Each structure stands twice: as structure tokens, then as C-alpha cells.
Amino acid sequence: TNELLELILKRLKPIAAKKNIELILESFRPVTAEIDETKLTLAISNLVENGIKYNHKNGWVRVSLNADHKYFYVTVADSGMGIPEDSIDHIFERFYRVDKSHSSEIDGTGLGLAITRSAILMHRGAIRVRSKENEGTTFSVRIPLTYIG
């Protein structure tokens, strides 16, 4: 799981570099888990890409990985524009766009977070979000170490 996150960040580094956004990976311990690598890579990539996409120049996106005896935890935090309180309950809906005024300058299908959520639920996991407008967003993902599909 550590290598998976390293690969995601390595792949997204050039995109982040265009906006001078620092990608930080904090790994608190080696984590080995039974996962569908393709689906989980897509899910975490979506979160990191959003962190880059909805960020300010010279911002940061921090990805951290931790685990206990039962679950592993991935947190994706950013210094971006944040999500308005009245939108937070809708962000995992398909085609929901938080800010329509930015949609012309920010590419996307509106499916990213819906796909992310379903991939995490498929792993019997959970995803939570905390956000404050103009202060950034933190997505917290919890997935059992042994998921049976």
C-alpha cells in the first residue's frame, strides 16, 4: 500500500508542478493490505487530483498512510479553496459540481468523487470529509486490511 501511494504521487507530480503545488507523503508504518489495486489507485488518485485541481498556486497536498491491527487509513489534505458547507453533503453524488462558475476553467466529469466513494465502499471502507471554505479540505479513508470482494 505504501508503494501504491508513492506511485500515485510520482505520476501526479508533473501536474502539481505546473501550479507549484507541493505533494507530501507521510507514511507512519509499512502497510500490507488485501486490495483491488486498480480501483484503490483510481480512488486515491481522484482525491489527490482534486487536491491539486482545486488548490491555489504554491499550495500543498499531503497524503498520509497509517494502520492499526484492523484497518489502514489514508488521509488526503490540501490547502485549497475548500468546499462550501451547503455542498458538503452532495459532493459524492454523480455529476455534482460544487462551483459551477469554475467549471469552465476546471476540467472534470463530475464523477470523480462518486467513483472514489464506490471503490472505497467496495473495499468495505468508509470515507469522510472535513472542509472549510478558503482553508482547504481533508478526506479521510478507512479500509479493512483484509477485504474479501
Language model segments and positions:
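Short beta-strand/loop element within the Bergerat-fold HATPase_c
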Residues: 58-70
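Short conserved segment of the HATPase_c
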Residues: 83-97
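Short helix-loop "hinge" at the ATP-lid/N-box region of the Bergerat-fold HATPase_c
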Residues: 51-52
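A conserved beta-strand-to-alpha-helix junction within the catalytic ATP-binding
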Residues: 1-13, 24
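Conserved glycine-rich
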Residues: 124-125
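Conserved catalytic submotifs in the C-terminal HATPase_c
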Residues: 17-18, 22-31
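Acidic ATP/Mg2+-coordinating residue in the GHKL
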Residues: 78
